[in-house]
Design a protein with these regions (language model features):
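Structural recognition of the beta-strand scaffold that forms the well-ordered cores
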Residues: 46-51, 80-85, 144-148, 193-197, ...
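Catalytic-core segments of thiol-dependent peptidases
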Residues: 85-187, 199-200, 205, 222-223
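C-terminal motif of bacterial Sec signal peptides marking the signal peptidase cleavage site
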Residues: 17-20
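Bacterial N-terminal signal peptides that target proteins for export
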Residues: 1-8
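Terminal, contiguous helix-loop blocks that mediate binding/assembly
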Residues: 26-40, 137, 159-197, 202-659
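Alpha-helical transmembrane segments
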Residues: 11-15
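N-terminal extension/subdomain marker
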Residues: 22-140
Length: 659
């Protein structure tokens, strides 16, 4: 059994290595004309569309698809759209040239190419600034909207990842630099009516603060967007029919059109899109800073606060994937985080939710993003120093910057200590932040079998208070066939956090696609539903199937397939829906019992998708299964329990502790 324990431990480590739209080439043409002068082109509304095609265009033609949606609208003479295209190695239409930055105008007269520049980096603030100046000079309007189209990476990584320049992106401070060079900025009279992000993950409190003297309204998504993105036909038609609408009305129209478009494509389960009134952001920033201050003072008074907050953050709705498998965006819904931290932070949590409700004037969200309040914030789920450093460069809140700095480094610099002193902290030194490494030994936490045959881990309240989560890993074992198969990670265990006692809930069942056992990894847990990542090959390409378990009806639902974050922090915008005839191959980590303990990723079962393809639990039948509890602290350090072994024979489960 000692050999089996090593296999299970290696499986848990190896598991961390796992990691729609498609448009045919579009017929499109634009007459080449000179750019208009400002006076002759003045309109009620001008939309400045910064279209960084990236691999969304070169692989799938998503940008061409949205431009085609625009061209299907008969615009009135009150509305015009100025589009800059770039950032893609290839365009799926007959007009755009990937070797140039091109500027087009679409209005009541037609579609025109009005300017060309040599290829430039769409992830550069200078490129954006030049486009904004061009639009301001040649195509002014009474009301303006600036729309960014591409990938998004949240507060730290920004948006507009140019695949021609190593996926360089515009960070929030670079967005600000570009607008500042093109416009006179003012919180009382911002130059832009609406700034919109048709990207993933950019409805953040840091984004809102960045644009508060640039625009009146922010329209963006907290979650990753489906590949279909915004429905340009819908909202541009509405704007053309009613050019007298203001920014708030336009934001609502964009949200409603987006929701309808996603529903039509059957990808609306996890959507989010919100409209934020940036003139009201000041009250939210004050409340957000107060929340951070209360958290920081709690943490320096008792560093055990960090795992307690970590448990609340893991329950709060978070976006883009925050696991080793999917990558970390470190973005969590601000309102839901405040809700879960209400007992930890009673003086400030409710004020945050009230301020959010005041400044988020409209939002849409799918049934499995029901807790979205409109803006997300940064939370360091992975305690990564490099990612935290990126956050510190753009953070809209000093208190949370110092809070995460203390959690990750265990100390604060002189500025951090001065900030602490300014909010009432009087000691000269900070206590060390406790981690599992401080109490770890060569022995794993013991497991015993109680009188009812349950595997129990009793770590006591002191160790439990260091943890932000407890999970389990399950492996199928066949000693006769000399094989061990990792089944996955879940939280379906009984938890007594107050006393530090955790107990298995093994029932001999596991998740499967059409009856074929699947590796499944918990990536989000809440009282209403859990979300799982299931690695597969889909028509020969590796994807993560997204599956939810809905506690309301006790059913699993397949939402679609998506790839995780890439090395640049870029979220995959293309949620692929399974289609009848698609080929799925399940992926598992497999090791021999007698070999060198190394796990390898194997293709297991291959089958075709049908109209009735579904995910559900199946009885695994007779066999031997091994489980370990997984303990995770506030720093994302992980340690393990000893192993429990379940032997199932004729439907009867016998449990024993491994020797």
């Amino acid at each position: 059994m000692k050999k089996l324990w090593k296999i299970l431990l290696l499986a848990a480590v190896c598991a961390s290595l796992l990691t729609g739209c498609f448009v045919e080439d579009v017929e499109m043409s634009a007459e080449r004309v000179e750019a208009a002068s400002g006076e002759e082109s003045y309109a009620d509304w001008a939309v400045y569309w910064y279209n960084c095609g990236s691999d969304l265009e070169s692989k799938w033609g998503c940008a061409s698809g949205d431009i085609k949606e625009m061209l299907s609208v008969d615009l009135s003479d009150k509305v015009q759209v100025v589009v800059q295209t770039g950032g893609a190695k290839k365009w799926h239409n007959t007009q755009m040239d990937a070797d140039k930055l091109q500027r087009y105008v679409y209005n009541s007269d037609g579609f025109y190419l009005v300017d060309e520049q040599p290829r430039g980096n769409m992830g550069s603030p200078e490129t954006l600034a030049d486009f904004l100046k061009f639009c301001k000079s040649h195509y002014p309007a009474a009301h303006t909207a600036v729309v960014f189209w591409n990938h998004g990476g949240g507060s730290v990584d920004g948006a507009a990842f140019d695949e021609n320049y190593d996926y360089d992106s515009l960070k929030l401070n670079e967005f600000y630099q570009a607008f500042q060079s093109a416009f006179d900025l003012s919180t009382d009279n911002p130059p832009i009516d609406v700034v919109g992000f048709d990207t993933c993950l950019m409805a953040t409190v840091d984004t809102a603060y960045t644009f508060c003297d640039i625009a009146r309204y922010l329209v963006a998504s907290e979650e990753t967007e489906p590949g279909c993105g915004w429905y340009y036909t819908g909202w541009l038609e509405a704007l053309s029919e009613n050019p007298g609408m203001d920014g708030a009305e336009l934001g609502k129209v964009i949200c409603d059109a987006f929701e309808k478009g996603c529903q039509d494509e059957e990808v609306a389960d996890e959507i989010t899109l919100s409209v934020t009134d940036l003139s009201r952001i000041g009250n939210l920033m004050e409340a957000y800073e107060s929340l951070g201050q209360e958290a920081l003072l709690n943490a320096v008074d008792n560093p055990g606060f960090f795992p307690a907050m970590g448990r609340m953050a893991s329950r709060a709705e978070n976006y883009g994937g925050n696991t080793e498998d999917e990558g970390y965006t470190n973005m969590v819904d601000l309102g839901d985080l405040a809700y879960h931290c209400a007992e930890l932070l009673p003086e400030s949590a409710n004020a945050v939710r009230e301020a959010l409700a005041d400044c988020v004037t409209y939002k849409v969200n799918g049934p499995y993003r029901a807790k979205a309040t409109g803006l997300s914030c940064y939370y360091s789920y992975n305690s990564d120093k490099k990612d935290y450093s990126g956050f510190a460069d753009i953070a809209a809140c000093d208190a949370f910057t110092y809070l995460y700095g203390y959690e990750i480094d265990g100390s604060l610099d002189d500025r951090g200590m001065a900030y602490l002193n300014g909010i009432g902290f009087e000691r000269e030194e900070l206590a060390e932040v406790p981690t599992l490494e401080d109490v770890s030994t060569e022995q794993d936490y013991p497991v015993y079998i109680d009188d009812e045959g349950n595997a129990v881990m009793d770590i006591g309240p002191d160790i439990a208070n260091m943890l932000k989560g407890v999970y389990f890993r399950l492996v199928y074992v066949d000693e006769e066939q000399d094989i061990a198969i990792l089944l996955g990670r879940d939280n379906n265990i009984y938890m007594d956090w107050e006393n530090g006692v955790f107990q298995d809930n093994f029932q001999g069942t596991w998740g499967a696609i059409d009856g074929y056992l699947a590796y499944m990894e918990l990536i989000y847990e809440s009282n209403d539903y859990n979300t799982y990542m299931v690695p597969i090959l889909l028509n020969g390409e590796k994807y993560n199937l997204r599956v939810v378990y809905d506690y309301n009806d006790g059913q699993y639902y397949i939402l679609g397939a998506r790839k995780g974050l890439d090395a640049n922090g870029m979220a995959d915008k293309n949620l692929v829906q399974l289609q009848p005839g698609d080929e799925i191959t399940t992926l598992h980590y497999v090791a021999s019992m007698s070999g060198d303990d190394s796990f390898a990723l194997y293709e297991m079962d291959t089958f075709k998708v049908t109209e009735s393809t579904s995910f559900g639990e199946v009885d695994m039948g007779d066999g031997e299964f091994a489980m370990m509890f997984e303990l995770v602290d506030a720093h994302n350090n992980t340690t393990w329990s000893e192993m429990a072994v379940f032997t199932v024979e004729d439907g009867v489960i016998r449990t024993e502790a491994a020797e």
